[in-house]
A protein has these predicted regions:
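Bacterial N-terminal signal peptides
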Residues: 12-20
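Alpha-helical transmembrane segments
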Residues: 4-12
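A residue-level marker of the well-folded mature domains of exported/periplasmic proteins
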Residues: 2-5, 17, 24-358
């Protein structure tokens, strides 16, 4: 059975890595080693010396192969759309590119699956060493992987998983780097149980874009975590990851006098919108709000009492690991089929130990 590498985002490690990687400003292009000037013909080395130098050069070449020295690989990074999260992800990508001396070419699909497929095919025609893919949706991701296989170009997936496996493992991928969305959804359920205790209550679920892997699997994990508890989801609606839409959803529920004591959101944008609506209605003390993601606004909202808890993982670390894993594969090193980056709980007691990245 193949192993899954799990990386818990420990408080100190996540914060230090976020600060360190975000501050890297090196170029993503490879730097060529200076050329060695040949000795004049009249100063030919002795035979024994030449042999020794040749042996030494061969050993150094072998060492370079095993230690993964910088090589000028070209990696296409395909992003699904513009969000603050992917700005932070790119910080990690760029830092790793500078560290490993590879060239990165970006493409943003603007949340259009057909556009992303066309972008991927363009890179296949131009020629790249590897495609690092954060797909718009799983279906389009599968098409890209199939097309890339036909073009003999390896694909690594990150952030958004492809296929139905909860772990993110998918045949045809070099590897998947990111969170297990089912586990992530379960964390929000555990936060809800911690906040409400044994009394439980009635929950509103505000979801992301319908049909996306995060929306489907986060809901699945939440429902699994709430099994056997006294917390019942009585209403769910999509906000499409948008703060204003979540605010409107909660305002409408308040006007309808629906009774609930917790709002569980699949992202921090929605949570801050829900919390704002409750605060403006004078109901925040009676209703708990839970977010997901650990954004700057989300962490600040926990500090300000607008929301009561969220989750955290490092987007910078995720971007760095995507390129690090890609380079290892291109260098012929063994990589695991999945590298999981875990979300951890954030509450008012520990929020000051986390640093928002996006």
């Amino acid at each position: 059975m193949r192993r899954t590498v799990k990386r818990a985002v420990a408080v100190g490690m996540a914060c230090v890595m976020a600060a360190g990687l975000a501050g890297c400003t090196g170029s993503a292009n490879a730097t060529k080693a200076p050329e060695t000037t040949a000795a004049p013909a009249t100063e030919a080395p002795k035979t024994e010396e030449a042999k020794t130098e040749g042996e030494s050069s061969g050993e150094e070449a072998k060492a370079a192969e095993t230690t993964g020295e910088k090589k000028d690989y070209k990696i296409a990074v395909l992003l699904p759309g513009p969000t603050g999260y992917f700005v932070a992800t790119k910080e990690g990508v760029d830092a790793a590119a500078a560290e490993y001396g590879v060239t990165i070419e970006y493409a943003d699909a603007q949340w259009d699956a057909s556009k992303q497929l066309a972008q991927a095919e363009d890179f296949m025609v131009k020629g790249v060493d590897l495609i690092a893919l954060c797909c718009v949706d799983s279906g389009s991701g599968e098409k890209i992987v199939k097309s890339a296989q036909e073009s003999d170009i390896p694909v690594l997936a990150f952030t958004n998983a492809i296929g139905s496996e909860e772990t993110g493992e998918y045949a045809g991928l070099v590897s998947y780097v990111g969170q297990n969305e089912v586990n992530t959804g379960a964390v929000t359920g555990e936060i809800a149980k911690n906040l409400l205790g044994g009394d439980g209550g009635k929950a509103i679920l505000i979801e992301g874009v319908p049909g996306t892997t995060p929306q489907i699997n986060r809901k699945k994990g939440l429902e699994q975590a709430l099994e056997g508890s006294n917390i019942e989801i009585i209403y769910n609606q999509t906000s499409n990851w948008e703060k204003e839409q979540a605010l409107k959803i909660v305002e409408d529920l308040i006007q309808k006098k629906m009774e609930f004591n917790v709002v569980i959101c699949q992202d921090d944008n929605s949570a801050t919108g829900a919390g704002q609506a409750l605060k403006e209605a004078g109901m925040k003390e009676d209703v708990k709000v839970i977010g997901l993601g650990g954004s700057k606004d989300g962490l600040q909202a926990v500090k300000d009492g607008v929301i009561d808890g969220t989750t955290y993982m490092s987007a910078v670390e995720e971007g760095h690991l995507a390129i690090e894993t890609s380079v290892k594969y291109l260098n012929g090193e063994k990589v695991e089929p999945v590298t999981e980056i875990r979300q951890v709980e954030v509450n008012r007691d520990n929020v000051d130990t986390f640093k928002g990245e996006w």
